[in-house]
Amino acid sequence: MRNGPRVQPNGERAIVQIVVRDNNVEQALRALKKKMQREGTFREMKRRNHYEKPSEKKARQKAEAIRRARKLARKRAQREGLIAKRGGTTRR
């Protein structure tokens, strides 16, 4: 399953909805922030803040692809036992 923004059939993004229970606005705000973070809304807002030249966009996408490939290779190596999993040791 993809963690990208949800897109409706007409191509527009879905509206994020949060239910406020028992007038607990703080909890609703935390849930909204978490949902927006998960869907990449903050990253998208930051990216759209300024114009991005096509060459910059291409470089960013290439860097993201390299990052994804490295992460996938690292996870695969951890599964096969070639490298230790991160966070397993404690520092003193």
Swiss-Prot record:
Family per record: Belongs to the bacterial ribosomal protein bS21 family.
Keyword annotations: Ribonucleoprotein, Ribosomal protein
A Pfam family: Ribosomal_S21
Region annotation Disordered: where it falls in the sequence: 37-92
Cellular component GO terms held in the UniProt record: ribonucleoprotein complex; ribosome
Name of the gene this protein is made from: rpsU
GO biological process terms, semicolon-separated: translation
Basic residues composition-biased segments: 68-77
PROSITE patterns (alphabetical): RIBOSOMAL_S21
GO molecular function: structural constituent of ribosome
Disulfide bonds: none
Compositionally biased tracts (Basic and acidic residues): 51-67
Keyword Ribonucleoprotein listed: yes
Protein name per its UniProtKB record: Small ribosomal subunit protein bS21
The species this protein was found in: Maricaulis maris (strain MCS10) (Caulobacter maris)
InterPro entries, A to Z: Ribosomal_bS21, Ribosomal_bS21_CS, Ribosomal_bS21_sf
Lineage: superkingdom: Bacteria
PANTHER family, per database record: MITOCHONDRIAL 28S RIBOSOMAL PROTEIN S21 (PTHR21109), SMALL RIBOSOMAL SUBUNIT PROTEIN BS21M (PTHR21109:SF0)
